[in-house]
């Protein structure tokens, strides 16, 4: 089972992407690890690290960073499961076993902050999935 960026170079144009996102596929590599049987890590580059939460509600106006999409913890009640469908992955087993890793999130954050006139007062880490995946401990 593939994802929409399979076989693309980092600089490739994804013609099936939403308007304005065509050049953001950025797949570096995918790999399986013996320590985490049945897990697949999809390494991608990201042009941005910060996300501005729209609205006025609970988190409205806040800034977040999510270094991953998907989560090894596999909590069945996780509200973020549905976001995997945006990647043409399923929100069930794929969310638990196919984790997208943004490998350059620190560099993207540095570049983004250097361009901002007014820096965020606070940034919340890992609001969509756990910011520390078990594989990082290896």
Give the location of each predicted region.
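Conserved Radical SAM active-site core
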Residues: 32-68, 76-138
């Amino acid at each position: 089972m593939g994802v929409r960026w399979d076989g693309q170079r980092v600089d490739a144009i994804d013609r099936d992407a939403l308007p304005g996102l065509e050049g953001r596929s950025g797949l570096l590599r995918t790999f399986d690890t013996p320590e985490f049987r049945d897990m697949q890590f999809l390494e991608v580059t990201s042009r941005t690290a910060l996300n501005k939460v729209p609205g006025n509600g609970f988190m409205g106006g806040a800034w977040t960073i999510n270094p991953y999409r998907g989560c090894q913890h596999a909590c069945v009640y996780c509200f973020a499961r549905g976001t995997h469908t945006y990647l043409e992955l399923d929100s069930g087993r794929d969310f638990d076993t196919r984790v997208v890793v943004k490998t350059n999130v620190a560099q993207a954050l540095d570049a983004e902050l250097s361009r901002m006139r007014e820096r965020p007062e606070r940034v919340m880490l890992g609001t969509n999935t756990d910011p520390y995946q078990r594989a990082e401990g290896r």
